Amino acid sequence: MDLHFENIRREYDKRSLSASDLTPTPFDLVTRWLQDAVEAKTYEPTAVIVGTATPDGHPSTRTVLLKEFMNNEFIFYSNYESRKGQQMAANPHVCLTFLWHELERQIHVEGDVRILEPELSDAYFATRPYKSRVGARISPQSRPIPGRSFIVQEFMKESLKYAGRTVPRPDTWGGFAVKPVRIEFWQGRESRLHDRFLYELRPDASWSVHRLAP
């Protein structure tokens, strides 16, 4: 069955983004927009789409939750041996996209990823709920499993193993930090004349900024 969606559209008219709103580097604006998303109680305000690619250019994306924006790096956590973990190990060039429908806003980031220091991953892992820590230990993320019962049984066994004890971070799980080289801010506007501003990192570590056509 064919599906046609050409009649589904809406106008974006809630906000604007002008040159006077910009900051010398993109980081203050990133902080402001993330705070706006949290304060507006948008659905999953820290959700971010992570785009990776194999060395020969085959892309894949998935949504994760940003856990920190620290030292001008975007930090999230996952399994090092997952599909994204393997792709980032082989090709560190990644992109991130934040989309807040309620604010009619989007941030797109391009940069290079690195593995976060182990002590920082340990510190974050210790803050996770008990069941989330157990789940991180037993999930062979992105690999085929016989069925849901397999992962449930593994979870139950690991839960019993660490009952009343500290659940240690597995060696296969930890943080990733993305250092940006390009950041685009997109604000929806009427008649599809959206506001777009692109920051690009210069060789001297300063940032250029240009308005882009919608």
Curated annotation (Swiss-Prot):
It is an enzyme of class 1 (oxidoreductase). Substrate binds at residues 9-12, 67, 124, 128, 132, 192-194. It catalyses: pyridoxamine 5'-phosphate + O2 + H2O = pyridoxal 5'-phosphate + H2O2 + NH4(+); pyridoxine 5'-phosphate + O2 = pyridoxal 5'-phosphate + H2O2. Binds 1 FMN per subunit. GO terms for biological process: pyridoxine biosynthetic process. Its cofactor is FMN. Keywords: Flavoprotein, FMN, Oxidoreductase, Pyridoxine biosynthesis. Gene3D superfamilies: Electron Transport, Fmn-binding Protein, Chain A. Pathway: Cofactor metabolism; pyridoxal 5'-phosphate salvage; pyridoxal 5'-phosphate from pyridoxamine 5'-phosphate: step 1/1; Cofactor metabolism; pyridoxal 5'-phosphate salvage; pyridoxal 5'-phosphate from pyridoxine 5'-phosphate: step 1/1. GO terms for molecular function: FMN binding; pyridoxamine phosphate oxidase activity. Signal peptide: none annotated. SUPFAM superfamilies: FMN-binding split barrel (SSF50475). FMN binds at residues 62-67, 77-78, 83-84, 106, 141-142, 186, 196. It comes from the Bacteria. Its EC number is 1.4.3.5. The keyword Protease does not apply. InterPro entries: Pyridox_Oxase, Pyridox_Oxase_CS, Pyridox_Oxase_N, Pyridoxamine_oxidase_dimer_C, Split_barrel_FMN-bd. Catalyzes the oxidation of either pyridoxine 5'-phosphate (PNP) or pyridoxamine 5'-phosphate (PMP) into pyridoxal 5'-phosphate (PLP). PANTHER family: PYRIDOXINE-5'-PHOSPHATE OXIDASE, PYRIDOXINE-5-PHOSPHATE OXIDASE. Belongs to the pyridoxamine 5'-phosphate oxidase family. Homodimer. This is Pyridoxine/pyridoxamine 5'-phosphate oxidase. It comes from Porphyromonas gingivalis (strain ATCC BAA-308 / W83). The gene is pdxH.
